[in-house]
Amino acid sequence: MAKRIKNTTPKQDGFRMPGEFEKQKQIWMLWPWRNDNWRLGAKPAQKAFLEVAEAISEFEPVSLCVPPLQYENALARVSELGSHNIRIIEMTNDDAWIRDCGPTFLVNDKGDLRAVDWEFNAWGGLVDGLYFPWDQDALVARKVCEIEGVDSYKTKDFVLEGGSIHVDGEGTVLVTEMCLLHPSRNPHLTKEDIEDKLKDYLNCVKVLWVKDGIDPYETNGHIDDVACFIRPGEVACIYTDDKEHPFYQEAKAAYDFLSQQTDAKGRPLKVHKMCVTKEPCYLQEAATIDYVEGSIPREEGEMAIASYLNFLIVNGGIILPQYGDENDQLAKQQVQEMFPDRKVVGVRTEEIAYGGGNIHCITQQQPAT
């Protein structure tokens, strides 16, 4: 049985969160099923999730966690793919965002593996959370750790989602003020308190605070739509010259800020420009999404956060969102230039964006040890 580690922190024990670009053992995912979040009984979303899983499975194993009532359905759909690199695990969940409710894995210099189980409150709890209850999602990290036999730290009274952090594995973490300082997360903590928590549980020494994200309403501005480390000393950041684009102000501010920063090692950051979609992505057929009391309803024509930067780095590859947009090919070209030694695989993910996230949001990497 995996243990809960008490009275100490990852920093004290010599564990750190590795960069996403470091070697991985597998990718974890959850299965979408909520009729009040996904269109058409979640069937289009399930198809998109499977296409993401199939793309990942070309490079490394995928563990796909599925609630009991969807187990046979998911098993049949995966069998149709013919992939032997995707395993199905029965696990109850509230929704499918394992980046945010799953464990953040840690490693040490001896090759040992541990994890952080952050407090999860569905992106805002009773202030502006997206659904209630969220008790099953709050158990996902612990369940994954039990399956893998990984000891974990529980952050008592500290709420954090995995999509709100990006690390370089060498002491630097990217976050946004919009999310981490939002009153629905940790209103009892100061900015300095939050920095201390990040340093203790990620074993980082420098926190780079980007001001705003591009998703103020659902995630309250997660960093993984805006900027990420692609290797130590280098970040990708969304960018557009189109002043009429809805992401223009936030993208420009983030790019300008990061271009002036150094990392924990004192290196000036090299900032790569990542394009945004030519046209914003808007939700269609919202009437096929059920209304359920306790969940935030989706409305026809609301803007989905379609960010190319919400890609996933895997062993030897990049799994990149595509939207049928004019800039899809440009995004692939830019990412290939950032990662010349990795194969870039594009997957159409509008259906995931309609539900509130994208490829990075629905995946969680487990490092190799």
UniProtKB/Swiss-Prot annotation:
Protein family per UniProt: Belongs to the agmatine deiminase family.
Keyword Hydrolase: yes
Active site: C361
UniProt keyword annotations, A-Z: Hydrolase
Species: Streptococcus mutans serotype c (strain ATCC 700610 / UA159)
Leading EC class: hydrolase
Pfam families per the UniProt record, alphabetical: PAD_porph
Any single biological process term in GO: putrescine biosynthetic process
Any GO molecular function: protein-arginine deiminase activity
Protein name: Putative agmatine deiminase
InterPro entries in alphabetical order: Agmatine_deiminase, Peptidyl-Arg-deiminase_porph
Coiled coil: none
Lineage: superkingdom: Bacteria
